[in-house]
Amino acid sequence: MLNFFLILNLVFCSGFSDSLETNWKLKKEENNIKVFLRKTLDHRQEYLAETIIHRDMNSIYEEIIDYNSSYKWMYKLESSKILDKKNDSLFYVQFTIEMSWPLKKRDLVSDVKIKKNKDFISISLVSSPDYIKSSDDFIRIKDSKSKCVLSKIDNETTKVSLQSYAVIDGIPSFIVDMFIVEGPLFSLSNLKSKF
């Protein structure tokens, strides 16, 4: 299996792997967004992107969890939708991801779990590949984790941290290298522009 970063940026701030081969390394800083990378012992490439948005935490949260509109601002998403909302802290979403020829389009089905307090919101997505039947039109991404952490700095300033990895078959490593940094930069820049 080759690693490919998840185009979803939703998502991210705490580590997903117990054992790490390397620590985070800053790879790019642009538009007040920092993107860090690291590899785990099982050779997954993870990214962590951080920025400050001058808006209250709850407004940013509402924008992020509007998964029916995520495709409008997230990198390479062709479509996005909420499949099932169990309650305010658990629901299921599906994303379809545009891939350049000759690669086949991907889709991802994830659960979304939300934890909140007055100064902190965590939005975690974990792949749930069997939640709905897969389509022949897409190759399903079966292993991914993403997390978005919103941390209140003050009433009008929020730190946003996105962390993610995904594993998909058949993606050459040079493609991974082209997009793993640009994806979170694109998505966080678009998110910031909404405020």
Task: Give the location of each predicted region.
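Sec-dependent N-terminal signal peptides
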Residues: 2-13
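Eukaryotic helix-grip
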Residues: 17-195
